[in-house]
Regions:
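Vicinal oxygen chelate
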Residues: 5-14, 32-35, 65-161, 186-200, 239-307, ...
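Core segments of cupin and vicinal oxygen chelate
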Residues: 12-55, 98, 106-116, 158-202, ...
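Short amphipathic alpha-helices in soluble, non-transmembrane regions
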Residues: 25, 60-62, 93-96, 171-172, ...
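Conserved donor-binding loop and adjoining core beta-sheet/short helix segment
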Residues: 33-38, 48-81
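Residue-level signal for short segments within beta-strands and strand-turn junctions
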Residues: 48-50, 63, 129, 203, ...
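Short amphipathic beta-strand starts and helix->beta connectors
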Residues: 61-66, 138-142, 200-207
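Surface-exposed interaction/gating patches
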Residues: 147-243
């Protein structure tokens, strides 16, 4: 019973149309699910991913009318996006520049070439070299050539003021192992290969606590086999980890809990998947609602802005 890497990462935007343009027309991802926040149906929940919406490739956004994030610790502070090969960095540098996106020159970070940049709201992103990347589905309609397309998430970086309590949760509750560290980053590994399995932790005791807003990350979700869901439910209960209890999101089943610094974690199943209610070739083209919200479709659609 082990984590298979990341499932998705959910962040916050205050401008859904501009967000949609950036992640599809600049980063070249596919909008695989256009739905709403199930706890706040006036807000879009947009899922961008590879060509099939595979777990581990989704970066998702809640659309909330909020001010910008106040950066600090106790937060998820950077999201890695995997690409393959050094030549891809040359293409992406030119592509980002053409689209007016500022970026930093690539550097080696824990042995991988990494290029940092931000979206229009200050969402901190990095392109990360993953030479072994094969676990993604191409998106034929992407603005990005196949050989340079983003393969998925990883690594994802947390900022905490003290490592000890977070380390205990990552290793004793979630079964991660400390892979390596340098002066500023501690890298933890899940049961998969490459950056999709790595959670990085920065220890930054001098920073103030972050305040969420546009440009911040709301939570990170970890991938498990569907069959392991009952066991993970029992594990959190047995270890007395305060959690949400089972939550059915229709496209996957979830468990939510917070690590000791308040950072929200989710455990999410790899099935049923986004094709549960839409054909693969039509993913994300219309508003998709879980069955319990379908009776309110007209009301919900009337309250949403056009993308």
């Amino acid at each position: 019973m082990q984590l298979k890497g990341f499932h998705h990462l959910t962040a916050i935007t205050a401008d859904a149309p501009k967000n949609h343009h950036f992640y599809t027309q600049v980063l070249g991802l596919r909008l695989v699910k256009k739905t709403v926040n199930q706890d706040d149906v006036q807000a879009y929940h947009l899922f961008y991913a590879d060509g099939r919406g595979n777990p581990g490739t989704d970066i998702t956004f809640f659309d909330w009318p909020v001010g910008p994030e106040k950066r600090g610790t106790n937060s998820i502070c950077r999201t890695g996006l995997r690409i393959k090969g050094e030549k891809a960095f040359e293409w992406w540098a030119a592509h980002l520049k053409k689209n007016g996106v500022k970026y930093k020159n690539p550097v080696q970070r824990l042995g991988r070439l990494t290029m940092d940049f931000e979206d229009f709201e200050g969402q901190r992103l990095s392109l990360v070299n993953d030479e072994s990347a094969t676990d993604f589905a191409i998106w034929e309609k992407s603005v990005v050539p196949v050989e340079y397309q983003i393969h998925g998430l990883g690594p994802i970086t947390l900022s905490v003021p003290d490592l000890a309590a977070t380390d205990a949760v990552l290793t004793k509750v979630m079964g991660m192992t400390l892979l390596k560290n340098d002066d500023s980053i501690h890298a933890y590994k899940m049961n998969a290969e490459g950056p999709v399995s790595e959670l990085h932790v920065r220890v930054e005791p001098l920073l103030p606590p972050a305040q969420q807003g546009a440009g911040s990350v709301h939570h990170v979700a970890f991938n498990i086999p569907f069959a392991d869901y009952p066991a993970w439910t029992n594990r959190l209960k047995d270890l007395r980890v305060p959690n949400s209890g089972p939550v059915d999101r229709f496209w996957f089943k979830s468990l939510y809990f917070r690590e000791p610094n308040g950072i929200l974690f989710e455990i999410a199943t790899d099935a049923p998947g986004f094709a549960a209610d839409e054909s693969m070739d039509k993913l994300g083209e219309t508003l998709s609602l879980p069955p319990f919200l379908e009776a309110r479709r007209a009301q919900i659609e009337a309250g949403l802005k056009k993308l």
